[in-house]
């Protein structure tokens, strides 16, 4: 920062005070030169504002004029196909308050969903379908219209091909829908990329583009029946491509057999399982047959049992009771009423009975009779849960 050598206000009048800044111009920079020229000439600001407004007006007029010119050219070549559309000029108004009617209406391009000019619609955001491309210079922002993009590019079609002006198929007549205000083509085999929509199939196809914040109107009411009712389902389904509609059920398309084919296999499995069970039962019986059969050996009678066996008939004859519990109670009372000598007789008979039993069944034990039922239950449970029944029986034997 250059400073005065003498300090104060003396010296050359071109020099300024020490607390002021001197702007130095960078030579060779055209942008900075223009900025300094504007600072030095403020009277030119009004001219720049006029230039900006004229450029903006031209950018708004050019797309509209181009759109009307293209519409005029296409209407001249397609007048014989739109007599029906001219009869209903006011039917195309949408009940949404004119949201879709802002800007020019392209009624000559039939078969498509018409959308407004996105460049002049104030309701569309800057990030919508085809916003204008702003170009900025050094100072003045210039809005350049998209000349490379056709003004009818916001049109939405169901075709993969790009739309070009003048490519309307003139050999296909168009039909005008009085409710929706848009024209459409009947489905024809000459148009492989356009898919006809039947009233039953429209609800199953999702729209390719969803507008946020705008009401959605059903399309099913606008399509008329182009074919008889007996042939509408078959013809409309046959015109869809093979990748949109699944084929008939069968092993050649999905690899999964038909349910009518699966059920016989299940039915064939039931006899197989039954035969397995029938095959298991003989093995269980054979294993039991292989085991040595032990007959049920009754234990020898004691003194009281011998007394009951002898006196039971007398008690039944004396009393009219037929209940065994009541008879046993009577016999028990009489047994305790006997003297020692009378009871000793039955004790001697019981001793002889035990000796005879030991001679007939040597090595017999009363545990064999009492533990046999529990043993059988345990074997059945082990065989049902796991196949360890034979090993357990071998261990117990």
Curated annotation (Swiss-Prot):
The modification Phosphoserine is found at residues 130, 164. It comes from the Eukaryota. InterPro entries: Catenin-bd_sf (IPR027397), CTNNB1-bd_N (IPR013558), HMG_box_dom (IPR009071), HMG_box_dom_sf (IPR036910), TCF/LEF (IPR024940). It is found in: Nucleus. There is a cross-link at residues 25, 267 (Glycyl lysine isopeptide (Lys-Gly) (interchain with G-Cter in SUMO)). Residues 1-60 are annotated as: CTNNB1-binding. Coiled coil: none annotated. It holds the Pfam family CTNNB1_binding. Keywords: Activator, DNA-binding, Isopeptide bond, Nucleus, Phosphoprotein, Transcription, Transcription regulation, Ubl conjugation, Wnt signaling pathway. Phosphorylated at Thr-153 and/or Ser-164 by NLK. Phosphorylation by NLK at these sites represses LEF1-mediated transcriptional activation of target genes of the canonical Wnt signaling pathway. Its main location: nucleus. Residues 38-102, 164-190, 266-296, 367-397 are annotated as: Disordered. Residues 80-96, 267-294 have a biased composition (Basic and acidic residues). Binds the armadillo repeat of CTNNB1 and forms a stable complex. Interacts with TLE1, PIASG, ALYREF/THOC4, EP300, MDFI and MDFIC. Interacts with DAZAP2. Belongs to the TCF/LEF family. Proline-rich and acidic regions are implicated in the activation functions of RNA polymerase II transcription factors. This is Lymphoid enhancer-binding factor 1. It comes from Rattus norvegicus (Rat). The gene is Lef1.
């Amino acid at each position: 920062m250059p400073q005065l050598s003498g300090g104060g206000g003396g010296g050359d009048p071109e020099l300024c005070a020490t607390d002021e800044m001197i702007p130095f111009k960078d030579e060779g920079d055209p942008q900075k030169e223009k900025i300094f020229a504007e600072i030095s000439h403020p009277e030119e600001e009004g001219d720049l504002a006029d230039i900006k407004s004229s450029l903006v007006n031209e950018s708004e007029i050019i797309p509209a004029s181009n759109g009307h010119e293209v519409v005029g050219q296409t209407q001249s070549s397609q007048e014989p196909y739109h007599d029906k559309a001219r009869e209903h000029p006011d039917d195309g108004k949408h009940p949404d308050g004119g949201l879709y009617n802002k800007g020019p209406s392209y009624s000559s391009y039939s078969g498509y969903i018409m959308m407004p000019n996105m460049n002049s619609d104030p309701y569309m955001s800057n990030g919508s379908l085809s916003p204008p491309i702003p170009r900025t210079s050094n100072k003045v922002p210039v809005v350049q219209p998209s000349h490379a993009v056709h003004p009818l590019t916001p049109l939405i079609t169901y075709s993969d091909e790009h739309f070009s002006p003048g490519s309307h198929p003139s050999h296909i007549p168009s039909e005008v829908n009085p409710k929706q205000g848009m024209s459409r083509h009947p489905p024809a085999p000459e148009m492989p990329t356009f898919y006809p929509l039947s009233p039953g199939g429209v609800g199953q196809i999702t729209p390719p583009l969803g507008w946020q914040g705008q009401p959605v109107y059903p399309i099913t009411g606008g399509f008329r029946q182009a074919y008889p009712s007996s042939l509408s389902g078959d013809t409309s389904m046959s015109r869809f491509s093979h990748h949109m509609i699944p084929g008939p059920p069968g092993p050649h398309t999905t690899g999964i057999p038909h349910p009518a084919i699966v059920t016989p296999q299940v039915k064939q499995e039931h006899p197989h399982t039954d035969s397995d069970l029938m095959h298991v039962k003989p093995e269980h019986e054979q294993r039991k047959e292989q085991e040595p059969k032990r007959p049920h050996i009754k234990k020898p009678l004691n003194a009281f049992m011998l007394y009951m066996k002898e006196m039971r008939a007398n008690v039944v004859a004396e009393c009219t009771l037929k209940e065994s519990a009541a008879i046993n109670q009577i016999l028990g009372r009489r047994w305790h009423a006997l003297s020692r000598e009378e009871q000793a007789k039955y004790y001697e008979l019981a001793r002889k009975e035990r000796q005879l039993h030991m001679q007939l069944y040597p090595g017999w034990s009363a545990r064999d009779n009492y533990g046999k039922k529990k043993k059988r239950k345990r074997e059945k449970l082990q065989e049902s849960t796991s196949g360890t029944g034979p090993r357990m029986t071998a261990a117990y034997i």
